Amino acid sequence: MPRSLKKGPFIDLHLLKKVEKAMESGEKKPIKTWSRRSMIIPDMIGLTIAVHNGRQHVPVFVTDEMVGQKLGEFAPTRTYRGHTSDKKTKKK
């Protein structure tokens, strides 16, 4: 179920402060965050945010199509390496 409109978007306060500071200074350095639950707001457009996926920080360049989605959607946590092949059937 989606979040109620009367509540507004959720964004962690420490991340919001980092975004505002980066917008004021005009820095292009990636902003590191562990907050996958924060929603992307229009102030973040054009910034690179390094989102933690449990192992490393994945750089995410924010565009206008991403507004309204969560940061964690762009940093996958699981790697799929494919199913192992059955060696018995390959020999035939």
Curated annotation (Swiss-Prot):
InterPro entries: Ribosomal_uS19, Ribosomal_uS19_bac-type, Ribosomal_uS19_CS, Ribosomal_uS19_SF. One of its GO terms (cellular component) is small ribosomal subunit. The keyword Ribonucleoprotein applies. GO terms for molecular function: rRNA binding; structural constituent of ribosome. Disulfide bonds: none annotated. Protein S19 forms a complex with S13 that binds strongly to the 16S ribosomal RNA. This is Small ribosomal subunit protein uS19. It comes from Psychromonas ingrahamii (strain DSM 17664 / CCUG 51855 / 37). The gene is rpsS.
